[in-house]
From Swiss-Prot:
Underlying gene: leuS
Residues engaged in binding ATP: K622
An individual GO BP term: leucyl-tRNA aminoacylation
Entries under PANTHER family matching the protein: LEUCINE--TRNA LIGASE, MITOCHONDRIAL, LEUCYL-TRNA SYNTHETASE
Protein name as catalogued: Leucine--tRNA ligase
E.C. number(s) listed in UniProt: 6.1.1.4
UniProt keyword Protein biosynthesis present: yes
Length: 860
């Protein structure tokens, strides 16, 4: 064994061994308990970043630990390879998205191997290959036949100059990212999948997900947004149709003083025919895309349509306004406004001088003060005619019943969730398998024409999708008749909604899934990824699983038993102000810093002498230039060091602060482990351990070893607090470094301890552990070694520490046998100099003894 720890030599050697032996390839084995450990698949952007490294290290630690427990562990990896960034990169680099993507995959695959992740590479998949997306296309056609897919018009961002649709991220300050033309909103036909048909099940089954973070479940509950309320119909004077609104607060209905409709509502459009102000307002709303997140904070604007609706219970005429906070795609595109009891309605009414009518009493029974804000709490009704004096629930039911009896109301359950629009007017995605015949009939692409292959040898102009620009591509024949293919492609969330299931049978040619393999491995036992995916990906992931279940492919209701959302990786961020006042961000690698005695950064400059402003720790990002390249760190310290730091620096679900000093610390620790094994093995062979012949000190050390095994097992397995597991191993290492190594049993005990330490560290730092296991002559490869089991007998304490007090003040701490009697403890305490001093010449009036813990002698 060489004396120095040289990761650059051992890591490549061990990785080659894993490749040659196909160590992590698995097949179904009914005789073994399975464990499916999955990290969210990466987008092949070109290089791994520290967020990837953290995610995949957590997954690898769990997978290797479960493997050592004797389970049949599947840990696959693949590439979420379609998407908009490839189009931009292709234009920039004068290439096509396909070669750019495949080059990135090859590069990043090597990076993953360099980090020593134990993946089953035989299952690797890339979602941009026809072998993958053909089954997604087939499944889509089946959903269409089931009535779960439909087409309707929906608004998109449209660049009138380039005559093209823009993704949300391509709209910058309301303008096209490429030509700076003002972006318009345009309605175009798009494909939707009826996720709303599964809304109740998606909501109710959250209760089955005991091992998902509550934050994620709450976000999904709110996103699905189930509410119970009443749909109310208003007659509108001088208008051919009625207006329907939905409210969850029918108890406030007597306080409704105006209605608001979306700018795109037919009533607003009709009113605008003779109202230039309203027509201009509608235009403004049409060209302003409002994300729901921004709705709460944006300025509320509106224009009176001139129409008057009739309140069905009071007969009063109330105005109908067009307002920018009402969206056509939500509900009916019309809302009732109760400004006395809804803050948004209150602000709008105050701004435009509309009537504000209170109908709910304040908590103390007085009329509410509405001079500053609305009263939004529930309470007792007044100012409401026959409903006065009713509390919230009674009023809800009474008003709902009355409206129903009059034929103008209906109790309804509503959802915030909208159907999933899967059409994208992009090139680099899976073609949507639908065709239109000459007579206008729309139908699915026949099975014998699947997959509809996306041409990869294309020229990108940065404006129009190559399959839209080439009229020949769309031409096809169906049943001998000419037809045109759909030129939209799927939302890339489609591919990432079912990849986890395809990993169970990546070579299967007969269909989307081999049910036997899928049902052996599924559901996923632990799924690891960022909380930013809580509502989009993780909802579609659950939805797709239910679709596949209902198609008879899988027999479970949910795709993953446990979800672990890892925290973000933070790093120091620095900038200097340029000549034009702009911020120039400087990489923390290039910052020369001064620290105070507490290690805080007080001053910083770069190599060019710029005084730097330190903004603290923030998420690693390109915009702040504070990303740390994992490859550089691996080349400097080795993969094991980077992995160990990642798992030690912070609990897995909390943010991790990148500190190179911490990486250096992890490296020093691994050098200490190496050195201890080197010194131990240099002394030659070891005798067998005789546990019955150990001295008290040897027993105490062995107790520490087995207590550490018990703690680390619990920390990794049950608690998943990996940082505390590493801390416990480090603490044990400190004790082993000080332990005597001269006697035969000292060395036998050291052998047992080091074999345990190396196995406990193996999930975290597999390369060094593989090597040290061989040097310690462990049985076989460590990859097939069992997890160490704590010896219960070794952990039993045969002595205990008792605190001795005289009149409540601590005078000594003594070690006594665990079975010592009170008399024996008193006798032993009396031998302590300080205790004897305070007992000299006084009478012990009372003895308080807590067995094995405390002896208090009360004297007087």
């Amino acid at each position: 064994m060489q004396e120095q720890y040289r990761p650059e030599e051992i890591e490549s050697k061990v990785q080659l061994h894993w490749d040659e032996k196909r160590t992590f390839e698995v097949t179904e084995d009914e005789s073994k308990e399975k464990y499916y450990c999955l990290s969210m698949l990466p987008y092949p952007s070109g290089r791994l970043h520290m967020g990837h490294v953290r995610n995949y290290t957590i997954g690898d630690v769990i997978a290797r630990y479960q493997r050592m427990l004797g389970k049949n562990v599947l840990q696959p990896i693949g590439w979420d390879a379609f998407g908009l960034p490839a189009e931009g990169a292709a234009v920039k680099n004068n290439t096509a998205p396909a070669p750019w993507t495949y080059d990135n995959i090859a590069y990043m695959k090597n990076q993953l191997k360099m980090l020593g992740f134990g993946y089953d590479w035989s299952r690797e998949l890339a979602t941009c290959t026809p072998e993958y997306y053909r089954w997604e296309q087939k499944f889509f056609t089946e959903l269409y036949k089931k009535g779960l897919v439909y087409k309707k018009t929906s608004a998109v961002n449209w660049c009138p100059n380039d005559q093209t649709v823009l993704a949300n991220e391509q709209v910058i300050d309301g303008c096209c990212w490429r030509c700076d033309t003002k972006v318009e909103r345009k309605e175009i036909p798009q494909w939707f999948i009826k996720i709303t048909a599964y809304a109740d099940e998606l909501l109710n089954d959250l209760d089955k997900l005991d091992h998902w973070p509550d934050t994620v479940k709450t976000m999904q509950r709110n996103w699905i947004g189930r509410s119970e309320g009443v749909e109310i119909t208003f007659n509108v004077n001088d208008y051919d149709n009625t207006l329907t609104v939905y409210t969850t607060r029918p108890d406030t209905f007597m306080g409704c003083t105006y209605l608001a409709v979306a700018a795109g509502h037919p009533l607003a459009q009709k009113a605008a025919e003779n109202n230039p102000e309203l027509a201009a307002f509608i235009d403004e709303c049409r060209n302003t895309k409002v994300a729901e997140a921004e709705m709460a904070t944006m300025e509320k604007k509106g224009v009176d349509t001139g129409f008057k609706a009739v309140h069905p219970l009071t007969g009063e005429e109330i105005p109908v306004w067009a307002a920018n906070f009402v969206l056509m795609e939500y509900g009916t595109g019309a809302v009732m406004a109760v400004p006395g009891h809804d803050q948004r309605d209150y602000e709008f009414a105050s701004k435009y001088g509309l009537n504000i009518k209170p109908v709910i009493l304040a908590a103390d029974g007085s009329e509410p003060d509405l001079s500053q804000q609305a009263l939004t709490e529930k309470g007792v009704l007044f100012n409401s005619g026959e409903f006065n004096g009713l509390d919230h629930e009674a009023a809800f039911n009474a008003i709902a019943d009355k409206l129903t009896a009059m034929g103008v109301g209906e109790r309804k359950v509503n959802y915030r969730l909208r159907d999933w629009g899967v059409s994208r007017q992009r090139y680099w995605g899976a073609p949507i398998p639908m065709v239109t015949l000459e007579d206008g009939t729309v139908m699915p692409t026949p099975d014998d024409q699947l997959p509809v292959i996306l041409p990869e040898d294309v020229v990108m102009d940065g404006i129009t999708s190559p399959i839209k620009a080439d009229p020949e591509w769309a031409k096809t024949t169906v049943n001998g008749m000419p037809a045109l293919r759909e030129t939209d492609t799927f939302d890339t969330f489609m591919e990432s909604s079912w990849y986890y299931a395809r990993y169970t049978c990546p070579e299967y040619k007969e269909g989307m899934l081999d049910s036997k393999a899928a049902n052996y491995w599924l559901p996923v036992d632990i799924y690891i990824g960022g909380i930013e995916h809580a509502i989009m990906h993780l909802l579609y992931f659950r939805f797709f699983h239910k679709l596949m279940r209902d198609a008879g492919m899988v027999n479970s209701d949910e795709p993953a038993k446990q979800l672990l959302c890892q925290g973000m990786v933070l790093a120091d961020a620095f900038y200097y102000v340029g000549e034009n006042g702009e911020r120039n961000w400087v990489s923390p690698v290039d910052a020369i810093v001064e620290r105070d005695e507490k290690g805080r950064i007080v001053k910083a400059k770069d190599a060019a002498g710029h005084e730097l402003v330190y903004t603290g720790m923030s998420k690693m990002s390109k915009s702040k230039n504070n990303g740390i390249d994992p490859q550089v760190m691996v080349e400097r310290y080795g993969a094991d060091t980077v992995r160990l730091f990642m798992m030690f620096a912070s609990p897995a679900d909390m943010t991790l602060e990148w500190q190179e000093s911490g990486v250096e610390g992890a490296n020093r620790f691994l050098k200490r482990v190496w050195k201890l094994v080197y010194e131990h093995t240099a002394k030659g062979d070891v005798a067998a351990l005789n546990v019955d012949a150990l001295t008290e000190d040897q027993k105490a050390l062995r107790r520490d070893v087995h207590k550490t095994i018990a703690k680390v097992t619990d920390d990794i397995g049950r608690r998943q607090t990996f940082n505390t597991a590493i801390a416990a191993i480090m603490e044990l290492m400190n004790k082993l470094a000080k332990a005597p190594t001269d006697g035969e049993q000292d060395r036998a005990l050291m052998q047992e301890a080091l074999l345990a330490v190396v196995r406990m560290l193996n999930p975290f730092t597999p390369h060094i552990c593989f090597t040290l296991w061989q040097e310690l002559k462990g049985e076989g490869d460590i990859d097939n070694a069992p997890w160490p089991v704590a010896d219960e007998k070794a952990m039993v304490e045969d002595s205990t520490l008792v605190v001795v007090q005289v009149n409540g003040k601590v005078r000594a701490k003594i070690t006594v046998p665990v079975d010592a009697t009170e008399e024996q403890v008193r006798e032993r305490a009396g031998q302590e100099h300080l205790v004897a001093k305070y007992l000299d010449g006084v009478t012990v009036r009372k003895v308080i003894y807590v067995p094995g813990k405390l002896l208090n002698l009360v004297v007087g």
